[in-house]
Design a protein with these regions (language model features):
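N-terminal ligand-binding/catalytic initiation module
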Residues: 1-172
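Predominant activation on well-ordered alpha-helical scaffold segments within soluble catalytic domains
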Residues: 90-97, 128-139, 159-162, 183-191, ...
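Flexible, glycine/charged-enriched surface loops at secondary-structure junctions
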Residues: 104-110, 144-149, 198-207, 255, ...
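Glycine-rich phosphate/diphosphate-binding loop of Rossmann-like nucleotide-binding domains
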Residues: 177-265
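Short glycine/serine/threonine-rich phosphate/pyrophosphate-binding segments
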Residues: 180, 215-220, 274-275, 296-298, ...
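Adenosine-phosphate binding glycine-rich loop
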Residues: 194, 286-386
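Rossmann-like adenosine-cofactor binding region
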Residues: 236-317
Length: 386
């Protein structure tokens, strides 16, 4: 996609940047000495802005990445994770923000893509102060970015953010937990995959290897079980696994063993990059369709899925229900309308599969093209001053 590049923003109320000790070497390649290489990372996928904020009183360290505001304000959740490095946190925020742009575009929403990450242990008891600091960070962007719940955060955390900014969704008493709507959209997407692959969208008797039994994975398991699917599940939390086993008649396996399960469908519903060089050698499935973000470690792994004859539901298409749910809150939609809109993921995926077949490209590229067509069309409209 082609969008005008913008400068990187930075807000940091207790951080100063020292002068460089030496002039930059014009012959040095960006990033070759291991520095953060911020602008190269921004330019790679044409992100508009990154804002970094540090609050010494709470220990808050946060990054907000805005990929695109062509279709509207950037919306994306806040992820609270103990990253191995600041660079890993930044790259995660950038990838997730780009995914949100494309997710909003293919879902037909008037929103751009953004994401925020808080670096640290999400088991901290100091949640109010920490999330109020994050709320001030969000507020500093003056509506260019709207946040919501994500991995490691909750609706209660969103209430703390609300004390400092109105640019937050997923609040208690409003749209609330997006997991049920996200799971319903994924369920409809799985059925679309079955329709494309087998000519029928029935999941009765289909075997599903479910990776992740958290909020979305649990609700998805219930929907799959209700239709007669046979589930094998895993999660790093034994209590989550126990609930799915007891309520959905699932078989449990160790976390790493899920890749070796022979099944019709692999449904990744935890963290990303699970389709990689190692797991591709182990998967024994015909369909990959789940709620996790950034499922492909690299684009070439999507090419390899295609080469192996595995039908892949692009992650940002099939997991768009959560974004649809928070968009419903922004516009005052009834819950039934949000669920109905999430159900349209079925038709969107069939369109993606059609483009892939017609153009002879992997499904992840077909999804990108569908999103980019809409973004480019609106960018042309908005270039005129009114």
């Amino acid at each position: 996609m082609k969008a005008p590049a913008k400068s990187s923003g930075s807000s940091s109320p207790a951080v100063s940047t020292p002068a460089p000790s030496a002039a930059p070497d014009p012959g040095r390649k960006p990033g070759e000495h291991g520095e953060l290489d911020l602008f190269s990372l921004l330019a790679e996928h044409e992100h508009e802005q990154v804002s970094v904020y540090y609050d010494p009183s709470t220990g808050y360290r946060g990054i907000i990445a805005i990929h695109s505001t062509v279709l509207g304000p950037a919306l994306g959740g806040t992820r609270f994770w103990n990253y191995q490095s600041d660079r890993a946190a930044l790259i995660d925020a950038l990838r997730l923000a780009r995914g949100m742009t494309y997710k909003a575009a293919v879902a037909g929403l008037n929103l751009g893509g953004g994401k925020s990450v808080i670096i640290g242990d999400n088991r901290t008891p100091r949640r109010e102060a920490l999330f109020r600091a994050h709320g001030r960070h969000v507020e500093s962007l003056k509506g260019r970015y709207i946040t919501a719940e994500d991995v490691g955060t909750s609706t209660s955390d969103m209430e703390y953010i609300k004390a400092e900014t109105n640019h937050v969704t997923g609040l208690i008493g409003r749209s609330g937990d997006p997991s049920p709507v996200t799971a319903y959209g994924v369920y409809r997407g799985v059925k679309a995959c079955a329709r494309y692959r087998y000519g029928s969208d029935s999941l009765a008797g289909k075997s599903v290897a479910l990776q992740g039994c958290g909020s979305v994975g649990y609700h998805l398991a219930k929907l799959l079980f209700a239709e007669g699917a046979v589930i094998t599940c895993t999660d790093i939390d034994p209590q989550r696994v126990k609930r799915v086993v007891e309520e959905c008649g699932a078989k449990a396996v160790a976390p790493d063993a899920i890749y070796d399960v022979r099944a019709t469908i692999f449904a990744p519903c935890a963290l990303g990059a699970v389709i990689n060089d190692d797991t591709l050698q182990r998967l024994q499935v015909e369909i990959v369709a789940g709620a996790a973000n950034n499922q492909l470690a690299e684009d070439r792994h999507g090419d390899e899925l295609e080469r192996r004859g595995i039908t892949y539901a692009p992650d940002y298409v099939i997991n768009g229900g959560g974004l649809i749910n928070v968009n419903a809150e922004l516009h005052g939609w009834a819950p039934e309308r949000a669920r109905s809109k999430a159900g349209e993921i079925y038709d969107t995926l069939l369109r993606v599969f059609e483009i892939a077949r017609e153009e002879g490209v992997p499904t992840y590229r077909a999804a990108d093209r569908l999103a980019e067509q809409r973004i480019a069309a609106i960018a042309k409209v908005r270039r005129n001053y009114v």
